[in-house]
Swiss-Prot record:
PANTHER family for the chain: LARGE RIBOSOMAL SUBUNIT PROTEIN BL34M (PTHR14503:SF4), MITOCHONDRIAL RIBOSOMAL PROTEIN 34 FAMILY MEMBER (PTHR14503)
Cited Gene3D superfamilies: 1.10.287.3980
Pfam families: Ribosomal_L34
One Gene Ontology term from the biological process aspect of the record: translation
Coiled coil: none
InterPro entries listed in its UniProt record: Ribosomal_bL34, Ribosomal_bL34_CS
Species of the source: Bradyrhizobium sp. (strain ORS 278)
Organism classification: Bacteria, Pseudomonadati, Pseudomonadota, Alphaproteobacteria, Hyphomicrobiales
Ligase keyword on record: no
Name this polypeptide is given: Large ribosomal subunit protein bL34
Signal peptide region: none
Similarity-based family: Belongs to the bacterial ribosomal protein bL34 family.
């Protein structure tokens, strides 16, 4: 059985990147929550 995590920078950015977060309402909520918490990194 192969491992489930097969790293790819492109897929990582597209799925969890800043622009991907901004594209949806839920993603914007995620960013707002992370800002409120004072996270150093908001997204991948």
């Amino acid at each position: 059985m192969k491992r489930t995590y097969q790293p790819s920078k492109l897929v990582r950015k597209r799925r969890h990147g800043f622009r991907a977060r901004l594209a949806t309402t839920g993603g914007r909520k995620v960013l707002a929550a992370r800002r409120a918490r004072g996270r150093k990194r908001l997204s991948a």
